[in-house]
Design a protein with these regions (language model features):
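ADP-ribosyltransferase catalytic core
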Residues: 39-108
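Intrinsically disordered, low-complexity repeat segments enriched in small/polar residues
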Residues: 16, 93, 101-108, 112-113, ...
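Charged, long alpha-helical assembly modules
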Residues: 147-193
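ADP-ribose/NAD+-binding catalytic cleft of ART/PARP-like enzymes
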Residues: 2-50, 66, 186-193
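Short, flexible beta-strand-to-coil junctions
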Residues: 17-23, 74-79, 136-138
């Protein structure tokens, strides 16, 4: 990890995905106001010890869409410490800060998820978990496109391993029709091997 002062470059949009206005850890966000982290240790190695607020950008948000059903634009207040997380699934696409403003709430749709897929620059190794994320959120068209574009006989074992790792947590395997469909399609590809 390294300390980074964020400046908007080339109209880069910073984004945060949240369930309505609460994080998955029950933090209640104030919309259009400065949110200040109760805990932030920029030198911590473990994300839980670091605290703060995570956010991403348009090029990497696809991987993190399972973190909520609404997407917000992120504004970084001037006196904010921001860390770019290099040791993660999307290096250069996950940031953590002690302060954040979330604004411009939009419900994430399958069409939006597909647009993020078309813009994404996540590494190939992050696509299996991105497939899991969009499947879990029931973005069927996006999931089917990732499956069609990315999964093949050469990488099917890796996709199934990552799928099982993600979906076996919290018994997500039967979460919705898209999860069931993609799971079945992955196993059909495996059978072709």
């Amino acid at each position: 990890m390294y300390r980074l002062h964020l400046e908007r470059k080339n109209d880069m949009k910073y984004l945060k995905v949240i369930f309505d206005d609460k994080s998955r850890y029950n933090y209640q966000y104030k919309i259009d106001e400065v949110n200040i982290a109760n805990n932030f240790n920029k030198d911590a190695k473990n994300p839980k010890d670091m605290g703060g607020f995570n956010f991403s950008n348009e090029e990497n948000i696809l991987r993190w869409l399972h973190n909520g059903n609404y997407i917000y634009d992120v504004i970084i207040p001037n006196d904010t410490t921001v860390i770019s997380i290099k040791e993660c699934a999307t290096p250069g696409g996950v940031f953590r800060s002690n302060k954040i403003i979330v604004t411009n709430k939009r419900k994430v749709t399958d069409d939006m998820a597909f647009e993020y897929y078309k813009k994404t620059k996540i590494p190939e190794s992050a696509f299996p978990k991105a497939l899991c994320a969009v499947s879990l959120m029931n973005y069927k068209n996006t999931a089917l496109n990732i499956l069609k574009d990315k999964v093949n006989e050469d990488n099917i074992d890796f996709y199934i391993e990552e799928w099982n790792d993600f979906m076996n947590k919290k018994d997500r395997n039967n979460s919705n029709d898209t999860v069931i469909l993609i799971n079945n399609e992955l196993h059909k590809i495996k059978e072709l091997e």
